[in-house]
């Protein structure tokens, strides 16, 4: 039995990386009453101590929780370890540009966590997330079900929100996915996008006041949203923090929720040996099932192109990494 399948009454999360994303995620755990114990790890120990103290002052307004500056030894009985640590994405830099800097960091962190005796679930959010989820799986030796990336969860939320604003409907009643890489080769699954069960094209047809040209161009704003935010404020962190909190809740509460995440494919969508954004059912065991929704020919081509781009980077990055390790 994994740690994640153990004591449901005391849920323990360890966060590795107390930067903008990590601290925002910890704040979301506190305000949403998720988990009973939250440990924060970072090379900047005074920062983790300060954040833990600051967050503890909110507990009288939320719910009891143990929050503290943790060490890697504290991972041994955690249900979930969330990885946000890594080199930040700079203005003009793609997520894939980050891979060479972050692979080494990832290996050091993951092997240290595994050495602690950790036997729960890894949730990866550091970018490029699909590649670092794959490397976490490789370096940990864990089953694929217990290594999950945030994938296109935030991209899909941005997509739903953008559609909602255009058609003037609550985003919670818009159902739509962005699949593929969390990055430049991601793509919208328009063929399954719907508002309250009505296919998006039917909705537009029935509501002539909806700007069709704006609908067509909507995805590009979604795809490039991170670059826009980074240019304006230096980093994105609130959206992904809440996405991570949602994933955490689904895992710890054994929800069997369907979310678009970076998951390992074994034949689904015609892909193998890759972590990439796809819908999956998740619960306390991790990934219960990858859902293969039927794509149009054009969408399938985009999935294949996205997977090919990721695999090319993975192969190049790992070859370089292994060569450096062998020196």
Swiss-Prot record:
Allosterically activated by fructose 1,6-bisphosphate (FBP). Pathway: Fermentation; pyruvate fermentation to lactate; (S)-lactate from pyruvate: step 1/1. InterPro entries: L-lactate/malate_DH (IPR001557), L-lactate_DH (IPR011304), L-lactate_DH_AS (IPR018177), Lactate/malate_DH_C (IPR022383), Lactate/malate_DH_N (IPR001236), Lactate_DH/Glyco_Ohase_4_C (IPR015955), NAD(P)-bd_dom_sf (IPR036291). It is an enzyme of class 1 (oxidoreductase). The modification Phosphotyrosine is found at residue 227. GO terms for biological process: glycolytic process; lactate metabolic process. Beta-D-fructose 1,6-bisphosphate binds at residues 160, 175. Signal peptide: none annotated. It catalyses: (S)-lactate + NAD(+) = pyruvate + NADH + H(+). The active site is at residue 182. GO terms for cellular component: cytoplasm. One of its GO terms (molecular function) is L-lactate dehydrogenase activity. NAD(+) binds at residues 21, 42, 47, 72, 86-87, 125-127, 150. It is found in: Cytoplasm. Substrate binds at residues 89, 95, 127-130, 155-158, 236. Keywords: Allosteric enzyme, Cytoplasm, NAD, Oxidoreductase, Phosphoprotein. It comes from the Bacteria. Belongs to the LDH/MDH superfamily. LDH family. Homotetramer. Catalyzes the conversion of lactate to pyruvate. This is L-lactate dehydrogenase 1.
């Amino acid at each position: 039995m994994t740690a994640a399948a153990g004591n449901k009454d005391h849920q323990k999360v360890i966060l590795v990386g107390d930067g903008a994303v990590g601290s925002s995620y910890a704040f979301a755990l506190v305000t949403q009453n998720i988990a009973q114990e939250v440990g924060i790890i970072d090379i900047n120990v005074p920062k983790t101590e300060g954040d833990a103290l600051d967050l503890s002052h909110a507990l009288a307004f939320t719910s009891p929780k143990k929050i503290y500056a943790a060490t890697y030894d504290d991972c041994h009985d955690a249900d979930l370890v969330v990885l946000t640590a890594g080199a930040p994405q700079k203005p003009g830099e793609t997520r894939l540009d980050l891979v060479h800097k972050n692979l080494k960091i990832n290996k050091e962190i993951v092997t240290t966590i595994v050495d602690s005796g950790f036997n729960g679930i890894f949730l990866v959010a550091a970018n490029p997330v699909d590649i670092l989820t794959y490397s976490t799986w490789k370096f940990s030796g864990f089953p694929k079900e217990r290594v999950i990336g945030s994938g296109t969860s935030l991209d899909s939320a941005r997509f739903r929100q953008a559609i909602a604003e255009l058609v003037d409907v609550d985003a919670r009643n818009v159902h739509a996915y962005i699949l593929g890489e969390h990055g430049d080769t991601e793509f919208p699954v328009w063929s399954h996008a719907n508002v309250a069960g009505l296919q998006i094209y039917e909705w537009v047809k029935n509501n002539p006041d909806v700007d069709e040209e704006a609908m067509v161009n909507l995805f590009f704003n979604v795809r490039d949203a991170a670059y826009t935010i980074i240019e304006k404020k230096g980093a994105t962190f609130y959206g992904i923090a809440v996405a991570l909190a949602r994933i955490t809740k689904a895992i710890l509460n054994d929800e069997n929720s369907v979310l678009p995440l970076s998951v390992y494919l074994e034949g689904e969508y015609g892909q193998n040996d890759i972590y990439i954004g796809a819908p999956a059912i998740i619960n306390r065991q991790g990934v219960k099932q990858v859902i293969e929704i039927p794509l149009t020919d054009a969408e399938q081509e985009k999935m294949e192109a996205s997977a090919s781009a990721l695999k090319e980077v993975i192969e190049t990055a790992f070859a370089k990494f292994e060569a450096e390790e062998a020196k």
